[in-house]
Amino acid sequence: LDYLKELEIDYLWITPVFISPMNDNGYDVADYYKINPQFGTMEDMDELIRECDNRGIGLMLDMVFNHTSTEHEWFRRALAGEKKYQDYYIFRDEPEDQIPTNWQSKFGGPAWEYVPSLKKWYLHLYDVTQADLNWENPEVRGELKKVIRFWKNKGIKGFRFDVINVISKPELFE
């Protein structure tokens, strides 16, 4: 950090360090409130924030709010049939043999995955393990605001929002 200060660096941007199955290098977040052990502990993060602050360097986190990992508690609860959490994501009731749209995932193949136990499809614009959040749901926006407040209260000075340009989805899927 001293070397960065000597270079007059005033912000340090780090990619996702949260709990993740790492199917997409951490961009598949399973818990926004915990540090992936591959990168250290929450105490390590607190120390990094403090040491950056001591040098006048702001720490900026990369936040992934278009989707979560399918291992996230919200998605697991959605799969368990909890309607509240199904509304956190974009599910469609089309028959198993009828994909809701012809949209393609950025990772290849259809952007929809069928869940036989629910008889529903969920949207994943990226990897099949990255279920898109439903930004039309005010509870989702509220949960994500809590995440931001949590990290701001820890001393994070800025955020980069990954693929924020795709959070808005049309009401009518064609």
Cite the ranges covered by each PLM segment:
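Acidic/aromatic-lined carbohydrate-recognition and catalytic surfaces
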Residues: L1-K145, R149, N153, I164-E174
